[in-house]
Regions:
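Bacterial N-terminal signal peptides that target proteins for export
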Residues: 1-10
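N-terminal signal peptide c-region/cleavage motif recognized by signal peptidases
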Residues: 17-19
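Boundary of Sec targeting at the N-terminus
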Residues: 22-23
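N-terminal mature ectodomain segment of secretory-pathway/periplasmic proteins
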Residues: 27-112, 140, 144-145
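Short amphipathic beta-strand/extended segments with alternating polar/hydrophobic composition
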Residues: 64-67, 92-99, 114-121, 173, ...
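Acidic/charged, solvent-exposed loop-and-adjacent secondary-structure segments enriched in E/D, K/R, S/T
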Residues: 105-131
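Short, conserved active-site entrance elements at the starts or edges of catalytic domains
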Residues: 122-158, 180-184
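Gly/Pro-enriched, hydrophobic low-complexity segments
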Residues: 152-247
Length: 248
């Protein structure tokens, strides 16, 4: 082998080495599942009740309220938010968002009751319980690592989830801890007649029954910022199926 050939081979090895060491989406996601507690621990979870407080920032000042989220396998969800808007001249606010696995409905004391928009329904169908990372392939969703970005001072893998229907989701997975620390997706806002991009940060992870749960979430968009602080998480609670359905 001539010196020129050896040099060319050496440069080729250097060129391909970074690509060979790059992690695939499957590897990153599986490490994230492990960091969150593992598949076996998640398999034990059939339902979850999360309670806490919510603060919504508005031009007129912060709105403080309570939030309850009930989840049940495989993808049922109910979110109940209550807040006092008397300081804004609007009285009590109650938003009861229900999804029974195939359709969704919102009971809203401020803006009126309504069916969920199709894009939101699709998003909830893709958000399987106890975690969407566990079976996204079974739902026909593809995933790929699109690079690395900073989330605050943390390096994070950016994994793009592309479902067969519904909005794409970008998950930012900490490159050291492998915990999912940020999510970006577009949400349909019928009141505005358009979609907006919403960023959600997952903070303050704590162990509950062998699973890592974020106890603080910060959501931001061009129209609204909110913070949810979790006070209690209960697994395998008794579920009233009627809470997921549209009231008759």
């Amino acid at each position: 082998m001539t010196l020129r050939t050896r040099l060319a081979v050496g440069l080729l090895v250097l060129a391909v080495a970074p690509a060979a060491s790059a992690q695939t989406a499957d590897e990153v996601i599986e490490k994230s599942i492990t960091a969150l507690g593992g598949r076996a621990a998640h398999a034990k979870m059939k339902s979850r009740m999360t309670t806490g407080t919510i603060v919504v920032s508005t031009p007129a000042g912060d709105i403080n309220g309570t939030i309850e989220v009930l989840n049940a396998a495989p993808n049922k969800a109910r979110t109940l938010i209550k807040a006092d808007l008397s300081a804004l001249g609007a009285g009590a606010l109650v938003v009861d968002q229900r999804f029974d696995g195939s359709s969704g409905y919102v009971l809203d004391s401020l803006q009126g009751d309504r069916d969920m928009p199709a894009s939101q329904v699709d998003g909830l169908k893709n958000s399987s319980f106890p975690h969407p990372f566990l079976n996204y392939k079974d739902l026909g969703t593809s995933a790929k690592v699109t690079g690395k970005e900073k989330v605050g001072d943390r390096d994070a893998f950016v994994v793009l989830f592309d479902p067969t229907s519904g909005p794409e989701v970008r998950q930012f997975i900490d490159a050291e801890t492998y915990l999912p620390i940020k999510m970006v997706m577009k949400v349909d806002v019928p009141q505005l007649g358009q979609e907006i991009e919403q960023t959600t940060e997952f903070l303050d992870f704590k162990d509950v029954d062998g699973i890592k749960i974020p106890f603080r979430l910060k959501a931001s968009s061009s129209v609204q910022n909110l913070t949810i602080t979790v006070s209690k998480v209960e697994h395998n609670v008794t579920v009233d199926e009627s809470l997921f359905a549209k009231p008759k």
